[in-house]
Amino acid sequence: MNDAFAGLPYRPCVGVMLVNSQGRVFVGRRIDDKDGVAWQMPQGGIDDGEELHPAALRELSEETGVAAELVTIIAESREEHLYDLPDELIGKLWGGQYRGQRQKWLLLRFAGEDTDIRLDAHDPAEFSEWRWVEPEQLPDLIVPFKRRVYRQVVDEFRDLI
């Protein structure tokens, strides 16, 4: 990381690992992905004064259309997970105010049907397509700078999935 960015803070964020009854995990392909490599689980910033669980349910609803009554919160990560953006993205995302994200992750069990997932529930949409994948597949689908965090989240939640 460029020393000019090292003093920037991390953006407070919540991540959601949504699992179905078969133990598969939701991933969405980012709508701005041109290369087919930017898949991710739902995640987003925590607003000032917002608590973790409501932030997770809000992000889930905005990005997937999944209503709160269709999920059960199973677990919360023991610690926050940090990642740094590549230097070339720091000035382009979040107004250049953050060096990366500080994420707390929640594991949620999905009790709905696939038809309850609506990527067009929020404008603008976050994802262009989605699928269920095995937890072990996640890190290989994710942009390289987030892979370490995804491995940590999979390892932490593996026995609960």
From Swiss-Prot:
This protein's record includes keyword Repressor: no
Q: Where is this motif: Nudix box?
A: 44-65
Q: Which cofactor does it need?
A: a divalent metal cation
| Keyword Hydrolase applies | yes
Cite the GO molecular-function annotations of the record.
bis(5'-adenosyl)-pentaphosphatase activity; guanosine-3',5'-bis(diphosphate) 3'-diphosphatase activity
Q: Tell me which Pfam families the record gives.
A: NUDIX
Domain Nudix hydrolase spans what residues? 9-155
InterPro entries under this entry?
Nudix_hydrolase (IPR020476), NUDIX_hydrolase-like_dom_sf (IPR015797), NUDIX_hydrolase_CS (IPR020084), NUDIX_hydrolase_dom (IPR000086), RppH (IPR022927)
Q: Which domain of life is it from?
A: Bacteria
Keywords attached to this entry: Hydrolase
What Enzyme Commission number does this protein have? 3.6.1.-
Instruction: Return one Gene Ontology term, BP aspect.
Output: nucleoside phosphate metabolic process
Q: What does this protein do?
A: Accelerates the degradation of transcripts by removing pyrophosphate from the 5'-end of triphosphorylated RNA, leading to a more labile monophosphorylated state that can stimulate subsequent ribonuclease cleavage.
Q: Which family does it belong to?
A: Belongs to the Nudix hydrolase family. RppH subfamily.
Question: Which PANTHER family does this one have?
Answer: NUDIX HYDROLASE 26, CHLOROPLASTIC, UDP/ADP-SUGAR PYROPHOSPHATASE
Which named protein is this? RNA pyrophosphohydrolase
| Species the sequence originates in | Novosphingobium aromaticivorans (strain ATCC 700278 / DSM 12444 / CCUG 56034 / CIP 105152 / NBRC 16084 / F199)
